[in-house]
Amino acid sequence: MKMITGVSKMCCDGVIQYLEKEKIPILIKNRHTCLDLNDSNMYVLKKGIVKVSLIMQDEREFNITYLQGLDVVSLYCDCLTQFRDCHPKIRIESEQAELYCISKEKFYKRVKEDANLQNYVDTYYRNRLKLAITREQVMIMNSKAGAVCSWLY
């Protein structure tokens, strides 16, 4: 079975070039620090590992995935919460993580103007949907071991 990855390196390079050109500040967060996703900023993981989870209405935490290296953490959380009434939680799992912090308004304005960034966002959502569907197929079609293996895959 072919492994599905987030987005192509070329698209990621375009996002990094934009962030560096605009001189977007880099935040350095320490292990077990949580990000506040209710503010008006977007976070792009540059280095490190973060855990993405959802806080359900009854306050249980449901772990979704771990993200490593370059990834738009806020887009991933937007994917998760678009159709659910739950709150995303992002926690730093590496010793330190470096994240770009940009205003959502500024980012989406730039996405509308730049075809490369628009392509990145579209590809990101499409690939995340493919990954979710593939994991669900493996879980549904297999036993308990298959369910565990689908998340390790």
Predicted feature locations:
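Cyclic nucleotide-binding regulatory module and flanking cytosolic helices
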Residues: M1-T33, V72-V73, C77-L80
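His/acidic/aromatic-lined binding-pocket segments of jelly-roll/cupin-type domains
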Residues: P25-L27, C34-D36, S40-K46, N63-T65
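A short beta-turn/loop motif at secondary-structure boundaries
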Residues: T33-L37, M139-N142
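Glycine- and acidic-residue-biased ligand/ion/polar-headgroup-sensing regions
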Residues: S40-S53, D58, G69-D71
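ATP/adenylate-binding site constellation spanning eukaryotic-like Ser/Thr protein kinases
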Residues: K47, G69, K104, R126, ...
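Cyclic-nucleotide recognition modules
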Residues: T65-T123
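Polybasic "coupling" helices that flank or enter modular domains
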Residues: A115-Y153
